[in-house]
Amino acid sequence: MTDRKKLLRSLDGEVQKVPPIWMMRQAGRYLPEYRATRAEAGDFLSLCYNSELAAEVTLQPIRRYGFDAAILFADILLIPDALGADLWFVTGEGPRLSTIETMEEFNKLKPADEVHDHLAPIYETVRILSRELPAETALIGFAGAPWTVATYMIAGRGTPDQAPAHKLMREAPEVFDALMDRLTEATIAYLSMQIEAGAETVKIFDSWAGSLKGEAFTKYALEPTKKIIAALKTKHPDTPIIAFPREAGDGYIGFAKATGADCVALDNSVSAAWAAEHVQVDGCVQGNLASSHMVTGGQALVDETREIVQAFSKGPHIFNLGHGITPDADPENVQLMIDTVRSA
């Protein structure tokens, strides 16, 4: 019997009868204890930068559910904040940022290696969690991928089709490429410090990768992820890395080999059976239950969960949702999912 944590064993390539389980956004508004702590912090950004409270909300779903991993509570837009972009959150609408559309605006950003003072509270959160998590619980750090973060910085907000970023890519490629390079370097620096602070694995979230097609997907989703992973592996060769090019479709095929990722996370737009045949052949996969099941529950949740576990049973697998859990989820449905996975 090994004492290596279940999540890390899957990332090592081990096939486990009962896969490790955690959820994207497992610390979130669906939990009453999270809502209470967020109210104490005052606002979302204050919660991210308050190391003690950020650690507390990270620990809450571990106490309640006993997940096999905790993911650092933070936000993908902390890097632009640290680079000097203005960032604020509008209640009910989400993030707002100062826009980067010209070289003059880009040149106001800080160099990538100057983000650490601003992000010091995040590293302290990681250190607290390293001390306080149960011995069997793995700690996941994370960052947004350069493309996804760039879409917010260019538009100044989330957009349904990422049109402003695509427009800048075509009309001012020198500005777009400079921003992508800056974000790539800042992401390397940020994740490396998370690992040094105690993160046992890190995940790169490319939430809008699916809006890139063909050569653009290769250049702006795959290649930056590859560069980040190569830099991290040079400095931290024993730290496994999870990549999530959400809604990549056929782009999931070969993504692990092309980027050097130890695991590819899958959204629920691809079936588990398809992914087992085309993606899991290269190693560990993570996913991919539709988050809507956390709202509706019932036998459909049980059946789909069992189907996913079975589909991925012949290779290394981490059970997760295909996207983050939503605020309207029922905490009891989360427990039902966990019980189903662990009794599979």
Curated annotation (Swiss-Prot):
The cross-references to CDD domains, in alphabetical order and at most eight, read: URO-D (cd00717)
- Enzyme class per UniProt: lyase
Keywords (A to Z) from UniProt: Cytoplasm, Decarboxylase, Lyase, Porphyrin biosynthesis
Q: Which GO terms describe its biological process?
A: protoporphyrinogen IX biosynthetic process from glutamate
User: Which Pfam families does the record match to this protein?
Assistant: URO-D (PF01208)
Q: Which GO terms describe its cellular component?
A: cytosol
Give the reaction(s) catalysed. Answer: uroporphyrinogen III + 4 H(+) = coproporphyrinogen III + 4 CO2
The EC number(s) given in the record are 4.1.1.37
InterPro entries in UniProt: UROD/MetE-like_sf, Uroporphyrinogen_deCO2ase_HemE, Uroporphyrinogen_deCOase
Kindly list the positions annotated as binding substrate.
Answer: R25, Q26, A27, G28, R29, D75, Y152, S207, H323
Q: For the site Transition state stabilizer, which positions are given?
A: D75
Q: Name one GO molecular function term.
A: uroporphyrinogen decarboxylase activity
Query: Which domain of life, per UniProt?
Result: Bacteria
Localized where? Cytoplasm
* Pathway per the UniProt entry: Porphyrin-containing compound metabolism; protoporphyrin-IX biosynthesis; coproporphyrinogen-III from 5-aminolevulinate: step 4/4
Q: What does this protein do?
A: Catalyzes the decarboxylation of four acetate groups of uroporphyrinogen-III to yield coproporphyrinogen-III.
Give the family, as the similarity comment puts it: Belongs to the uroporphyrinogen decarboxylase family.
Report quaternary structure and partners: Homodimer.
Q: What protein name is recorded for this chain?
A: Uroporphyrinogen decarboxylase
Q: What species is this protein from?
A: Dinoroseobacter shibae (strain DSM 16493 / NCIMB 14021 / DFL 12)
Q: What is the lineage of its organism?
A: Bacteria, Pseudomonadati, Pseudomonadota, Alphaproteobacteria, Rhodobacterales
